[in-house]
């Protein structure tokens, strides 16, 4: 019997409009796709620090148009001060 092939998620890097609060917390507000479509984030329902596979980023559970999705923030190399990180969503290939 054949075992099902496990599909690994593919990272899709996206532009995100976000705010920092007065305590340094990062809050995503909207996702902008490469084709220009903008999706406002209605709510952030959960946050998991260090959730990416290499523990270098965070996972936000967000709600867009009533649907729950995950949005990830991947921190970049600390040697480049002007680049804090980048955002991605996952798509199963």
Where are these regions (language model features)?
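Cysteine-centric segments in proteins
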Residues: 1-93
